[in-house]
């Protein structure tokens, strides 16, 4: 799903102050996660129960790496989970264009994640002009992790490649500071 803002005579430019999309889960699933952080994704993934995220957060942080999570219960997407019955659930986003990325903040009492958008310097979550769309919010459920990987949903929700000729693109190895 995503939110669409059609052109309106009296609404042209507007500010997103917050997005409160919620994902209510049915239990204390096993999750593979990294901390929600505005500045880096350079963390080792943690495998834990959802209820253990806050207690494991401090051990994941390396103060020498400029890591600053926004919350002790905040994680980045894509968030992969497995239920006790063996179903795999993934929460992510697609078509992220001119919009802040979505993190997820967990309420451990209810196992409900609320979207948390990366703010700009003024604390605003987004500046938009109609007509426009938010990114797609995706929830995938599959019987196995390999079925999750085989899904083309995220690819298909993104815009098609704007380049007509991609033959010149070749895979390479890179070592260095990016």
Give names to the regions the model predicted:
Residues 1-167:
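N-terminal accessory beta-strand-rich subdomains and adjacent acidic, glycine-rich linkers
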Residues 170-178:
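N-terminal small/glycine-rich loop or linker at the start of catalytic domains
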